[in-house]
């Protein structure tokens, strides 16, 4: 059974059992700062399980895209070396929110596996929590499962919990037995870590609420959460004991093999093939969901995975940019399940190619540093300073270095690496991840927001946080988080950044950098205490930075006007895809398939500025969600709204009507001026506009005018003529470049004639091994081709030095390729000058970084003849 068929059969089966199908969500968790990526199907329903959210259904089924790389669930280091670890996988799951429980969950799982998929009953094994007699009785007495194939396991294996406190419960796992020919024992046995018994389905019965004292309080409404890896199930059904041998990976594996030099032994690089096949899956989908390579957070996880894949490609002998070439193969594989990948393919290819080109510049240098360190090792551990230098200077993620070390049966000095890292850590990171438990919220209370009406207020301090822990006081110079009873500070939400400002009284001053808000309603004021000692219970004056707030309000209101104008000019298919509003600028992402013309940009700008000049009042209404819909108020797709919503109306004839919790101007004239500074594509079908308002927009216009005046002076024209004048210059430049190309070709031809005089005869073979002066690396191949034609039979080695780098070309005429291969001669020379290359028996190209050894290297070619 094909993977696509399994995926659909699972959804169809549970839909027939009254489950609502939930499409796979983004890999980026919605409104959840505790996770870098969605790593299980239940992540979509965390708030439902914890009682924070209610859905219009009580049964759900999903096939969720997941990533496990970074954080608590990190499979990255195992990928490639095992049969079943992946950074990206699909999780099949069925869920009950207070509807059915253990009996139905077990029955559905059993029926789906044995009747829908026809798995042999005798090949299955089950585990239950050691204290869960109920689940075991259902398996034995109602399903008829043999007791001798049930393992009772402890908390580590068969008890699930969301966190240190909160929803939790026992689980029952279903395993598949691959047979006696594979080593390993059943769950709960000493040899359970073998590959014979493989877990395929985990049924979690969430029936308790774990208290802070460890007590398990029964939930009033127990739930079911199950998870089954699609790749593992496909391996079972396709009679493979390695996930990478299933149909879902074969097109990728073939593409990787085709990219690998024929001389390379693929069998010796199976791990590398698996690494690359896995990593293109996770990286492509991360990019589709809006992640870009960076040096922190999700972006750094993406960068680590891309670079690990690239390194394994180089290990297999792939010396060209290759990783992005696998994206179209992947898009074809998932064209029906996830068509969004095909839609975003140009962006995926662009991001992957750019990242590989960037890393390729330092990969070879970093590998040389690492090879030198390994050569000079006294023991079996690579020192922390070297590991850090690879990370900091050459862009080697720590797990990539660890990966290479493991291949050499070495380890890395993590303590030494961490010591070096501490010197670079930002003080702001001391605050760490912070979450007040539900129990503490009940005791402390939530923050009352006053910021719509006022920018300052007096409040008591409810709680203080330092180094991720609740504390009683914060001292001068320390970074921390302050929780207030009432606050005028707006907390980051809906694309609008949180407020900054000062919390103070006669003795203390706490500078607030930014403000966040937890789902519970607790406002977190992040910052540093400049003077005094701040204590829980103190009374302070909270003062929002007024200038910053006014700038933010201008930009936020302008964003609403922009959204409305886009829908009028481009059509109502325009929907918001994301936004950023801060004190300096606004950024707005929206759905649209084409580049916006200059004419349309002018229309949009003009429309918005006319609304600003109209200076109408901005109206705010708190109304029922149904009434808001009747007013055609724009709501953000994917956002969850309460029954009562805040509606902002701007301009005559209700020009803009949107649901919004942000802060805004009182009159549209307060925006002052609106100017679009850029329009670009973000991904397939998504465009981005960046803009300025107020004095920032005026300064932008002023700079543009000054630049135009400077160009006019340089081109000896006035502002009205400058475009025509620059167009003439560009045309002239193009004509000159064409003439230069003609002259270069003539020069190249003449150089070939000049070099014939340097040809030597070595053992009756014509040999030319020399530096070509006044040429570029691009010219060498043409010169070599002309020399081969003129000499008839020869070995030609040409080099050129530019900016302390050597370019090499080796040409061998066809009659000599059985005795002398260009690629072997090239690598012989390149190794002596710190480089490498590649090519065919008759023509090869490469280079090096040590020109001081070039003369000796060229002279040594004679010894090969």
Curated annotation (Swiss-Prot):
Top-rank lineage group of the source organism: Bacteria
GO BP: alanyl-tRNA aminoacylation; negative regulation of DNA-templated transcription
Annotated positions binding Zn(2+): 556, 560, 660, 664
SUPFAM superfamilies (alphabetical): Class II aaRS and biotin synthetases (SSF55681), Putative anticodon-binding domain of alanyl-tRNA synthetase (AlaRS) (SSF101353), ThrRS/AlaRS common domain (SSF55186), Translation proteins (SSF50447)
Reactions mediated catalytically: tRNA(Ala) + L-alanine + ATP = L-alanyl-tRNA(Ala) + AMP + diphosphate
Database matches in Pfam families: DHHA1, tRNA-synt_2c, tRNA_SAD
Enzyme Commission number: 6.1.1.7
UniProt keyword annotation of Ligase present: yes
Annotated CDD domains: AlaRS_core
A GO molecular-function descriptor: aminoacyl-tRNA deacylase activity
Example of a GO cellular component annotation carried by this entry: cytosol
PROSITE patterns reported for this sequence: AA_TRNA_LIGASE_II_ALA
Cofactor(s) it depends on: Zn(2+)
Cofactor binding, note field: Binds 1 zinc ion per subunit.
Key words of the record: Aminoacyl-tRNA synthetase, ATP-binding, Cytoplasm, Ligase, Metal-binding, Nucleotide-binding, Protein biosynthesis, RNA-binding, tRNA-binding, Zinc
Top-level EC class as recorded in UniProt: ligase
Compartment(s) where it occurs, according to its Swiss-Prot or TrEMBL record: Cytoplasm
The keyword Signal is assigned to this record: no
This protein's domain notes: Consists of three domains; the N-terminal catalytic domain, the editing domain and the C-terminal C-Ala domain. The editing domain removes incorrectly charged amino acids, while the C-Ala domain, along with tRNA(Ala), serves as a bridge to cooperatively bring together the editing and aminoacylation centers thus stimulating deacylation of misacylated tRNAs.
PANTHER family referenced in this protein's UniProt entry, alphabetically: ALANINE--TRNA LIGASE, CYTOPLASMIC, ALANYL-TRNA SYNTHETASE
Role of this protein: Catalyzes the attachment of alanine to tRNA(Ala) in a two-step reaction: alanine is first activated by ATP to form Ala-AMP and then transferred to the acceptor end of tRNA(Ala). Also edits incorrectly charged Ser-tRNA(Ala) and Gly-tRNA(Ala) via its editing domain.
Family recorded in the similarity comment: Belongs to the class-II aminoacyl-tRNA synthetase family.
Protein name per the record: Alanine--tRNA ligase
């Amino acid at each position: 059974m094909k993977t696509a068929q399994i995926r659909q059969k699972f959804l169809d089966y549970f839909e027939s059992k009254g489950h609502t199908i939930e499409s796979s969500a983004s890999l980026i968790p919605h409104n959840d700062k505790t996770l870098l990526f969605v790593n299980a199907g239940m992540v979509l329903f965390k708030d439902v399980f914890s009682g924070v959210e209610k859905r219009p259904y009580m049964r759900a089924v999903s096939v969720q895209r997941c990533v496990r790389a970074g954080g608590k669930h990190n499979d990255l280091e195992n990928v490639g070396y095992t049969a079943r670890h992946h950074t990206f996988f699909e999780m099949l799951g069925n869920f009950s929110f207070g509807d059915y429980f253990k009996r139905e969950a077990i029955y559905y799982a059993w029926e789906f596996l044995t009747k829908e998929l026809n798995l042999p009953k005798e090949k299955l094994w089950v585990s239950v929590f050691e204290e869960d007699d109920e689940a075991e009785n259902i398996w034995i007495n109602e399903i008829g499962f043999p007791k001798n194939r049930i393992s009772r396991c402890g908390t580590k294996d068969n008890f699930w919990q969301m966190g240190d406190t909160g929803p939790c419960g026992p689980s029952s796992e279903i395993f598949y037995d691959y047979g006696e020919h594979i080593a390993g024992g059943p769950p709960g046995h000493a040899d359970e870590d073998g590959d014979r018994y493989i877990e395929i389905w985990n049924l979690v019965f969430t029936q308790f609420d774990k208290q802070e004292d460890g007590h398990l309080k029964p939930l009033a409404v127990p739930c079911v959460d199950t998870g089954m890896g699609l790749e593992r199930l496909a391996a079972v059904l396709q009679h493979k004991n390695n996930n990478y041998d299933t149909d879902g990976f074969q097109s990728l594996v073939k593409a990787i093999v085709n990219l690998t030099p024929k001389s390379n032994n693929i069998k010796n690089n199976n791990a590398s093939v698996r690494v690359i096949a896995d990593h293109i899956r996770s990286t492509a989908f991360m990019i589709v969901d809006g992640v870009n390579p960076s040096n922190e957070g999700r972006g750094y996880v993406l960068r680590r995975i891309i670079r690990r894949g690239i390194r394994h490609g180089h290990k297999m002998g792939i010396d060209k940019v290759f990783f992005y070439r696998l994206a179209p193969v992947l898009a074809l594989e998932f064209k029906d399940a996830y068509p969004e990948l095909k839609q975003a393919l140009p962006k995926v290819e662009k991001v992957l190619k750019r990242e590989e080109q960037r890393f390729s510049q330092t990969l070879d240098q970093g590998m040389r540093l690492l090879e030198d360190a390994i050569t000079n090792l006294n023991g079996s551990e690579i020192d922390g300073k070297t590991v850090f230098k690879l990370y900091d200077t050459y862009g080697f993620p720590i797990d990539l270095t660890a990966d290479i070390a493991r291949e050499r049966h070495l380890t890395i000095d993590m303590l030494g690496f961490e010591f070096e890292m501490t010197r670079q850590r930002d003080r702001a990171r001391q605050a760490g991840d912070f979450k007040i438990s539900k129990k503490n919220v009940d005791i402390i209370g939530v923050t009352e927001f006053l910021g719509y009406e006022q920018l300052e207020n007096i409040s008591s301090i409810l709680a203080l946080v330092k180094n991720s822990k609740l504390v009683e006081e914060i001292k001068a110079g320390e970074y921390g988080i302050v929780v207030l009873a009432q606050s005028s500070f707006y907390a980051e939400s809906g694309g609008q950044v949180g407020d900054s400002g000062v919390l103070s009284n006669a003795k203390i001053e706490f500078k607030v950098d930014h403000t966040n808000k937890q789902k519970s309603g607790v406002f977190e004021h992040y910052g540093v205490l400049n003077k005094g000692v701040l204590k829980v219970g103190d009374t302070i004056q909270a003062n929002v930075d007024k200038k910053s707030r006014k700038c933010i309000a201008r930009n936020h209101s302008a964003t609403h006007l922009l959204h409305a104008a886009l829908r009028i000019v481009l059509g109502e298919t325009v929907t918001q895809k994301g936004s950023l509003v801060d004190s300096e600028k606004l950024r707005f992402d929206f759905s649209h398939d084409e580049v916006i013309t200059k004419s349309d940009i002018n229309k949009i700008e003009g429309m918005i500025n006319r609304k600003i000049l109209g200076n109408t009042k901005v109206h705010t209404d708190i109304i029922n969600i149904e009434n808001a819909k009747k007013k055609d108020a724009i709501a953000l797709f994917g956002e969850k709204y309460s029954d009562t919503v805040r509606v902002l109306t701007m301009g005559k004839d209700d020009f803009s009507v949107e649901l919004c919790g942000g802060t805004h101007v009182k009159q549209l004239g307060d925006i002052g001026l609106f100017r679009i500074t850029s329009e670009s594509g973000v991904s397939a079908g998504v465009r981005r506009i960046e803009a300025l308002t107020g004095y920032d927009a005026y300064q932008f216009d002023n700079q543009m005018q000054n630049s135009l005046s400077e160009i006019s002076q340089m081109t000896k024209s006035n502002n009205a003529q400058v475009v025509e004048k620059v167009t003439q210059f560009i045309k002239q430049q193009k004509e000159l470049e064409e003439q230069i190309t003609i002259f270069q070709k003539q020069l190249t031809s003449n150089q070939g004639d000049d070099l014939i005089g340097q040809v030597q005869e070595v053992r009756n073979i014509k040999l030319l091994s020399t530096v070509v002066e006044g040429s570029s690396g691009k010219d060498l191949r043409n010169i070599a081709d002309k020399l081969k034609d003129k000499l008839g039979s020869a070995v030609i080695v040409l080099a050129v030095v530019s900016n302390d780098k050597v370019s090499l070309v080796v040409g061998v005429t066809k009659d000599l390729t059985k005795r002398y291969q260009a690629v072997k001669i090239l690598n012989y020379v390149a190794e002596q000058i710190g480089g490498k290359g590649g090519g065919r028996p008759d023509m090869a190209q490469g280079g090096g970084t040590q020109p001081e050894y070039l003369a000796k290297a060229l002279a040594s070619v004679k010894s090969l003849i």
